[in-house]
């Protein structure tokens, strides 16, 4: 079973940090926020739909608590408790009346189906729920906030590169169960990379909502791959509604990996990719969606669209991806339906690598193992900065795109040196590009290496 081990020493250090964090927090915020008090963290837009509230407040909470260096396990637990309390209240007081605008009648009918809530009011109410929970926990921190966390070494690096804007986003969520209050015996960890185009809105939205939507799928426990597929579909549907309301035109490809017990489940849209390395050999888990793929080309043409070769293969002469969240004006040719696959883990797996096309367009799969092994040799088994080196390789090879690389070690990096590089070719997994489950802020450079 490929999973990190809970580290008691790390947890003891975390436990000792919680009282100090609570004391400092309540000293800075001695009372709930009044209506006149400035909000201590950026509000996610002006309005939220009912379906968006939980995910957006989770993002707000984790960003705010992270900025105050809250212990990670505590941040997840207090976020879950505060949001649970807020969602049990009547949110109708935050309902926003639609603005009076001259709109097409059809658009007005569509808007009427969505209840919009005031984001600023929700954020203020949530901060007060957070304050209330922290006040209660200052007296007695519950065991759930001190529960041992599974340890993962995750190396992440992202750069804007030569592009004007950074449109990539990524998610590293080893405490998936704790964040969503899942109490079964299956440990779950979630990792994702989203590669936006035409703006950052879609990538940011997907990085906030896909895992929250997945957590609510009934199939999460019985068919996780199907749950991930549905989470992508639902996120696309929600973002399209937002895009029509706010006149957004962006889209995003994406890839995610959910480790659930002794199984790995992946889902993807577009050309962001994930590979698994096992005993020094690349295991191909997926086939990226590209317009030149014969099945994708046939699907697009059957809908009345076309695929043409310009500087690269493009859908309807515009987008270089055939599936994505968003891209409201290219639906249904650019599909929001993800593919998914599953694989049992044996404990012999080395690491996962998730990356956008800014990396994989210039670094083929079969070169990854050699690059990682060389880095570990030079750094005596320390994998903390491996993602940074992989990004540098892609940049030096001429990638001009945003580049994001995430390496999730499934074994201690030092152990990987003992066997050497056993193979550099691709091994085809027993999963393909179909569902076989039954067989952070916009920064130019983001570097994260963590035990989480």
Swiss-Prot record:
Catalytic activity: O-phospho-L-seryl-[protein] + H2O = L-seryl-[protein] + phosphate; O-phospho-L-threonyl-[protein] + H2O = L-threonyl-[protein] + phosphate
InterPro entries: PP2C, PP2C_BS, PPM-type-like_dom_sf, PPM-type_phosphatase-like_dom
Keywords for the protein's UniProt record, in alphabetical order: Apoptosis, Hydrolase, Magnesium, Manganese, Metal-binding, Phosphoprotein, Protein phosphatase
GO molecular function, one term: protein tyrosine/serine/threonine phosphatase activity
GO cellular component: cytosol; perinuclear region of cytoplasm; protein-containing complex
Gene3D superfamilies: PPM-type phosphatase domain
PROSITE patterns: PPM_1 (PS01032), PPM_2 (PS51746)
This protein's record includes keyword Magnesium: yes
Cofactor(s) annotated in UniProt: Mg(2+); Mn(2+)
One example of a Gene Ontology biological process annotation: apoptotic process
Tissue/organ expression: Expressed in the liver.
Function: Dephosphorylates and concomitantly deactivates CaM-kinase II activated upon autophosphorylation, and CaM-kinases IV and I activated upon phosphorylation by CaM-kinase kinase. Promotes apoptosis.
Complex formation: Associates with FEM1B.
Descriptive protein name: Protein phosphatase 1F
Organism (species): Mus musculus
């Amino acid at each position: 079973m490929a999973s990190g081990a809970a580290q008691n020493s790390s947890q003891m250090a975390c436990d000792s940090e919680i009282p100090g964090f609570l004391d400092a927090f309540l000293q800075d915020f001695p009372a709930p926020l009044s209506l006149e008090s400035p909000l201590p963290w950026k509000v996610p837009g002006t309005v939220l739909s009912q379906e968006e509230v939980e995910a957006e407040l989770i993002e707000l909470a984790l960003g705010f608590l992270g900025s105050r260096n809250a212990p990670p396990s505590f941040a997840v637990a207090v976020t879950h408790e505060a949001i649970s309390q807020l969602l049990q209240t009547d949110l109708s007081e935050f309902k926003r009346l639609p603005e009076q605008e001259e709109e097409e009648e059809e658009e007005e009918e569509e808007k009427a189906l969505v209840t919009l809530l005031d984001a600023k009011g929700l954020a203020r109410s949530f901060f007060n729920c957070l304050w209330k929970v922290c006040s209660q926990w200052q007296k007695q921190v519950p065991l759930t906030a001190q529960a041992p966390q599974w340890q993962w070494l995750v190396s992440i690096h992202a750069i804007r590169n030569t592009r004007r804007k950074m449109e990539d986003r990524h998610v590293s969520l080893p405490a998936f169960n704790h964040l969503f209050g899942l109490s079964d015996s299956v440990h779950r960890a979630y990792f994702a990379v989203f590669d936006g185009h035409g703006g950052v809105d879609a990538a940011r939205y997907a990085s906030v909502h896909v895992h929250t939507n997945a957590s609510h799928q009934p199939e999460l426990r019985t068919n996780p791959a199907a749950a991930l597929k549905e989470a992508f579909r639902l996120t696309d549907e929600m973002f399209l509604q937002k895009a029509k309301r706010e006149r957004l035109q962006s889209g995003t490809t994406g890839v995610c990996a959910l480790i659930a017990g002794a199984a790995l489940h992946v889902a993807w849209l577009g050309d962001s990719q994930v590979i698994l390395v096992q005993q020094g050999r690349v295991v191909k888990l997926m086939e990226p969606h590209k317009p030149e793929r014969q099945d994708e080309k046939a699907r697009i043409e059957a809908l009345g669209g076309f695929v043409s070769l310009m500087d690269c293969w493009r859908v309807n002469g515009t987008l270089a991806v055939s599936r994505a969240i968003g891209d409201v004006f290219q639906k249904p040719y650019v599909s929001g339906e993800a593919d998914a696959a599953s694989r049992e883990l044996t404990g012999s797996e080395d690491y996962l690598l998730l990356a956008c096309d800014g990396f994989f367009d210039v670094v083929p799969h079969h070169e990854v193992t050699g690059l990682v092994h060389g880095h570990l040799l030079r750094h005596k088994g320390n994998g903390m900065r491996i993602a940074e080196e992989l990004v540098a390789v892609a940049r030096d090879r001429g990638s001009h795109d945003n580049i994001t690389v995430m390496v999730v070690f499934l074994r201690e990096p030092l152990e990987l040196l003992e066997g050497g590089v056993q193979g550099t070719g691709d091994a085809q997994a027993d999963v393909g590009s179909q569902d076989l489950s039954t067989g952070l802020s916009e920064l130019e450079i983001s570097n994260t290496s963590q035990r989480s």
